[in-house]
Amino acid sequence: MAARVLLARGGLLRPAAQSAFLPGLRTVTSSSHRAREDSWLKSLFVRKVDPRKDAHSNLLAKKETSSLYKLQFHNVKPECLDAYNKICQEVLPKIHEGKQYPCTLVGTWNTWYGEQDQAVHLWRYEGGYPALTEVMNKLKENQEFVNFRKARSDMLLSRKNQLLLEFSFWNEPVPRPGPNIYELRSYQLRPGTMIEWGNYWARAIRFRQDSNEAIGGFFSQIGQLYMVDHLWAYRDLQTREDIRNAAWHKHGWEELVYYTVPLIQEMESRIMIPLKTSPLQ
């Protein structure tokens, strides 16, 4: 969401130039611009982080559910992608449907734009960490899954995962019919800014729900910390462009973007295509 107000140089985030240099960028009065510029610079160099009274998981996550999410990234050998997809579509739905496993396959995709030959899987564990441990222990005794993992390991270049909680102000991801493309926008936040990010996005999310594009919003608990992942669905790339542009015509969106930009260290966008067995189509 920060693309309109950022220019990247040497990996450092900075505010975009005045509209005289970028035609079409919204203009503000010089006094207002100077005030915002001063505020923005102060947020970079003299930011004061207020002490927290509780953990992020207690302040930002949903209280009515103890669900835990696992996000997996598998980088596949290019010549093995079709075979990898085939065995995933054979085995993963059985875990999803198995009553003995307290977990749900939220979605499974191949990255279309972004890192190539990559598979992305999102799981939900109803019951938190105990459910995750239960599933792991039961799968160790599942010979079909053991064989699947062995075959899969020969197809992979690398893999990583994260354990996530869901922001309280996002809806829980639910299956949806297709066809859709999906965008996973990942933000590496500056340490100490997660609460502020949550506060801003609790207001910003209302600007991004008119077309039912918001799937889920998550923050990391284990893995790469201070990571935020937002998952969106669109009919196609042009629809994505139209929906994102429309947000800029809504009063309040630009200001929320402006104040979330300084919280970001890095950001990445993946456009993903669901596999045939993905609950999110």
Swiss-Prot record:
Keywords noted in UniProt: Autophagy, Cytoplasm, Mitochondrion, Transit peptide
Major subcellular site: mitochondrion
One GO biological process term: mitophagy
Compartments, as annotated in UniProt: Mitochondrion matrix; Cytoplasm
Gene Ontology cellular component annotations, sorted alphabetically: cytoplasm; mitochondrial matrix; mitochondrial outer membrane; mitochondrion
Keyword Transmembrane helix: no
Lineage top rank: taxon: Eukaryota
Transit peptide as recorded in UniProt: 1-27
Pfam families: NIPSNAP
GO molecular function: protein-macromolecule adaptor activity
Reported function: Protein involved in mitophagy by facilitating recruitment of the autophagy machinery required for clearance of damaged mitochondria. Accumulates on the mitochondria surface in response to mitochondrial depolarization and acts as a 'eat me' signal by recruiting proteins involved in selective autophagy, such as autophagy receptors (CALCOCO2/NDP52, NBR1, SQSTM1/p62, TAX1BP1 and WDFY3/ALFY) and ATG8 family proteins (MAP1LC3A, MAP1LC3B, MAP1LC3C, GABARAP, GABARAPL1 and GABARAPL2). May act as a positive regulator of L-type calcium channels.
Family: Belongs to the NipSnap family.
The protein's assembly and partners: Interacts with CALCOCO2/NDP52, NBR1, SQSTM1/p62, TAX1BP1 and WDFY3/ALFY. Interacts with ATG8 family proteins (MAP1LC3A, MAP1LC3B, MAP1LC3C, GABARAP, GABARAPL1 and GABARAPL2). Interacts with VDAC1.
Protein name: Protein NipSnap homolog 2
Lineage: Eukaryota, Metazoa, Chordata, Craniata, Vertebrata
